[in-house]
Amino acid sequence: MPFALGQRWISDTETDLGLGTVVAVEGRMVTLLFPATGENRMYAKEEAPVTRVSFNVGDQIASHEDWTMTVEEVQEKDGLLIYVGVRTDNDEPVALKEVFLNNFIKFNKPQDRLFAGQIDRMSRFTLRYEALINQHQRRRNPTRGLAGGRVSLIPHQLYIAHEVGHRYAPRVLLADEVGLGKTIEAGMIIHQQLLSGRAHRVLILLPETLQHQWLVEMLRRFNLHFSLFDEERCIEAFADAENPFETEQLVICSLDFLRKKRRRFEQVLEAEWDLLVVDEAHHLEWSEEAPSRAYEMVEALAEQVPGVLLLTATPDQLGHQSHFARLRLLDPERFYDYDAFLAEEQAYGQVASAAQELLDGETLSDEAKRILASQLEGLDLSDAAARQQAVAKLLDQHGTGRVLFRNSRANIQGFPERHLNVYPMPLPEQYKTAIKVMGMMGGNGGDLQTRALRYLYPEKIFQQFEGDNATWTQFDPRVEWLLELLLSARQQKVLVICSEAATAIALEEALRTREGIRGAVFHEGMSILERDKASAYFAQQEGGAQVLLCSEIGSEGRNFQFASHLVLFDLPLNPDLLEQRIGRLDRIGQQNTVEIHVPYLEGTSQRALQLWYHDGLDAFEQTCPTARPVFEAVRDELFELLAANTGDQAPLDALLVKTRELHEPLKARLEQGRDRLLEIHSSGGAAAQQLVDKLAAEDDDTGMISFALKMFDEIGVNQDDRGENALVLTPGDHMLVSSFPGLPQDGMTITFDRNTALSRDDMALLSWDHPMMRGGIDLILGSEIGATSVALLKNKALPIGSILLELIFVAESAAHPQLYRFMPPTPIRLLMDKNGQNLGEKVAFDAFNRQLTPVNRHLGSKLVTASQPVIHGLIGKGQAIAEELKGGIVDKARAQMAQTLQQDLDRLEALKAVNPNVRDSELDYLRNLQAELHHLIDQTQLKLDAIRFIVVTHN
């Protein structure tokens, strides 16, 4: 290698040193100074791992004074290069000696890196190309955002999420019955809206008691990091911004908090949101004369926020007027007059009845034919297919079908049976004494609800007098009974739920110390991580806990459907909480009958409450949509009965009669009022099943797993296989980056298997939508990882020393999330021979890749230097070929975009003629989007992303 003082070289092994300058050439040694870091390196001249830095005509280079120039000519004098050209800031002619080049020059273009000897491993070049292909496919995928959640593939949930999540600024009422997964549907919609870029800022308003449940669900299921805002958080955030709600993109807030703090509500209103989600929307009371403060607040937000999701399990149970009020929040122009709404509903009721006859497949009555003919032009009912088509058209024109989704258990398959087992037990003397003493000491005070609650939990009364360490578990017959149940069902997983964390902790200790039963506790005093560990211990089949003991609040939002035995150690006073408890096991996908075990102490209010739930509402063995209104109607009488704690049968019998008289007609009315047309629309039918099949096929695709493992290997992430489909990832000591996106410093347990993730809250479900996968791909493509490579091709059919140049171009336009459906960054691969012919279409990447042998960076640099002029020429020819191919890609994307959006527009315009629920803003949005995307597709640019230089050898 001819070295000369002042020449600029770059280290092949320590590229972060920047540009080096030759400062000494003595005998067989050469010394380089790297001014950027102030370090010296001495090398043997013959084997120095360095590459000469030389630029070419057309390159832009920077001087040590930070001005840049465009090279027009390269001269050489005494072994030193002089770059002649013009400055980019003032167009003055200039000559720059290489010794005055900027020491911090970075080689960002792949060709510059190749010629500067910054050559990467061949495996990283492969990883980069695969990352481009995978990114391209994912961004075009219509199910993007659906597959990534830790959720079961349940047809109706996926259908609703897909249908709503793809809309611009969706405004809908999600009104599935309890247990059908409204929170999951909302989470999937939010996830899609965020990933697609349709939304960036999301506000969720909830009752205070549900805040943590939503926080955990959004994080655990969808990897969405919401922030919980209360007064303390607002004060804290005030240091960073005048409006605290502008410091986070994803916010959860209590509606009650905003109602009490007017200034905070004004700040929420001033912050700009893309999507508003309101849970328990049936609590928003409205009348034309006097709407509630909570309703007015949501109304004010709904007027400003483009997208609104309202969640309620009771769309019409609380009366038609409140149902109208919620629809009015979504579209006040459409639902402007209550009387007009009632008239329309009545007319629609006739259509729904006619549709019911159509669905039942019976001979249509004359009235039904008349109604259907008035709704559908050219009505054809000749065969089953024609009837199905008629139903499909009715669905599209459906009264509130675009804004309201409602599924009931009656129209959704896959729920298990529920079976109640009750165990009456004598009231221990210790409890009798404690209750008597409390009465003598005047401890029966408090409001009606407080007194009703007191006698449901006699262990708390006992502790009141004996202290917190009182060992009630030694004499309470429910504890002995629970021990026997667990010992008799050693192979069964048992979930125990009680109202208080202290009860769960005491029970776990009693089970462990008396019989060595393996258990775990799960309560609100534990951190999310501690709860995850307890949940994972319970889920473990080998060596896991047999029993999980949960408090009321601790169990919110968790599903344990791998267990089928539920022990209700005590009963909640609220029927919604009872259903929530049973819902931990009673889920779609539960394989067995859910065995519900209820022990109670005779002669106490525990027995009265158990009978009220079972004989009055049938709430143990069936979901009870009437429970809430019936509970509100008999609340005072129920509380009086429980507070009396006498065990008298007469008042209990009277209450049971009254409860049934309210429950049965209301249940019949709800069943009769079921909107079959709406349910068919909401469940998705065949379209929903197609979605499930598509996502299941994606789950079975091993391509994502092999790419993920390859990515972790190349970046330097440690992987430890723990069995049971689990892999522990931890940051490696020699990673290419200081931290891997989404990977905590203490590591993370992941699985690629959906079923494993559903039963193990301590594991992350890795999918293409997971932040680690998206972040990993962005990390690779946003850096120079794998941008250059050199390889040998052993092929005796080709002349030795022949060269090939593999060029990876990317065609891309401005980053617009809506554009990705049609024109995501698109890789164009060329394989150029020495004559400038493209062999890329004839020689597939994978097959070619398997024939190549990697070379080390030093040898690779020498091979590149020897062929530099040829490589330059091939890059120029490749650019011209890629431009031509880009034209075809752009034309195809433009045509697909125009066709897709025009179809959407035509359908909505036709629908608007018969269904007023299509908003003008949706039509305007599509028209504007069409024009904007047309312009962006025309602006598509080409960039060279990666180069691989290949030399043919016969050895």
From Swiss-Prot:
Q: Which InterPro entries match?
A: Helicase_ATP-bd, Helicase_C-like, Helicase_RapA, P-loop_NTPase, RapA_C, SNF2-like_sf, SNF2/RAD54-like_C, SNF2_N
Question: What is the name of the gene encoding this protein?
Answer: rapA
- Motif span (DEAH box)? 279-282
Q: What is its EC number?
A: 3.6.4.-
Q: Which parts of the sequence belong to the Helicase C-terminal domain? A: 478-642
All copies of domain Helicase ATP-binding, residue ranges = 163-333
Species name: Aeromonas hydrophila subsp. hydrophila (strain ATCC 7966 / DSM 30187 / BCRC 13018 / CCUG 14551 / JCM 1027 / KCTC 2358 / NCIMB 9240 / NCTC 8049)
Keywords of this protein's UniProt record, alphabetized?
Activator, ATP-binding, DNA-binding, Helicase, Hydrolase, Nucleotide-binding, Transcription, Transcription regulation
**Protein's UniProt name:** RNA polymerase-associated protein RapA
Q: Which Gene Ontology molecular function entries are recorded, alphabetically?
A: ATP binding; DNA binding; helicase activity; hydrolase activity, acting on acid anhydrides
Question: What is the role of this chain?
Answer: Transcription regulator that activates transcription by stimulating RNA polymerase (RNAP) recycling in case of stress conditions such as supercoiled DNA or high salt concentrations. Probably acts by releasing the RNAP, when it is trapped or immobilized on tightly supercoiled DNA. Does not activate transcription on linear DNA. Probably not involved in DNA repair.
